[in-house]
Structure formats: C-alpha cells, structure tokens
Amino acid sequence: LLIESTYGGRVREDFDASLKKFEQDLARDIKKYNTIVQTCFSLDRLQKILFYTIDMQKKGLIPNNIPILVDSKMGAEYINPYIDEAKKMLREASHPSQLAVNTKNLENFIDYLDPKNKNYEVISTETRAGILGELDGKKKIILTASGMAEGGPVIEYFKRFADDEKSVFY
C-alpha cells in the first residue's frame, strides 16, 4: 500500500484562517522588505495567490503601485484556463469550489487575472534580468514556481535575493 502524504501528520487551517494569515503577513512584510518572493505550485496555487494578492491591492491592504511579477511559464499558461472556468461557472451558476473563491468573487477573479488589465506582469528567462534590473531597490512581489527548491526560476531568485536583508521568501 502506497499513500501520498505531502501534508501527512499535519492539521491544516481552514481556508478563511489561512487567507487572513496570508493577508496579514503580506501587508506586514511589504512595509519591511523590497522584494517578496512567493514560491508556489504552478497549477492552482499560483493562480489563487495571484488573485488574492491583486485583491489586496484593490482593497488597499497593500499599495497598488507595487508590481506583481509572475515567473512561471506553466503557471502563466494556466491563467487563461482558470479564467475560462470561472466564466463557465458564472454562466452555469455552479459553485466555484474548484477555484476556492466564492461566487461574488468570480467576476473579480476574471477581471483581475485577465492579462489585458495589466494587474500583473509575466516574466520569463529572457526578460527576467532586465525587469529585475529596472526594479532593483524597488518594492516588488514575485510569484514563481518552486520546483521543490531543486530547479526552476526559484533557483535564480535564491541566488539573487537569499543574502539580501530587504528580501523575504514565502
């Protein structure tokens, strides 16, 4: 018998408590640090964290002039399918449990994550150095694929920001 146990032996907080803690931590840390690197799974987690980070800006919980950068090719590729699924849920009046947002947030989810609204910027291996150079010493929030800290963009962020006292990793 083989059982996957990523969260084995741990009791996880309920969603609302986790979201509140995330909001409190981000609001506190954005005042203290220039760079926040949020590592996350490319599928599902990145899209949710992106939504809630933009939502915090829209609500005035964190400054809305701080750039949010998405550095995950796969994570960026899954944004539009998530938007499509949210639109489908609205059309069909189905419950949005798969997106972990309540019905009143579906329209915001669609709006905030729509790339044409420029609430965030997708960066890549080719554009990373230039964009980070432009933002050197300025506040920024970076959502990146974690690769279990063994590979992917997060390695570049470890190299660049691990020793920087004005940077924090989530």
PLM features per residue range, with description:
Residues L1-S18, K32:
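Metallo-beta-lactamase
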Residues E23-Y170:
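Hard-cation-handling environments
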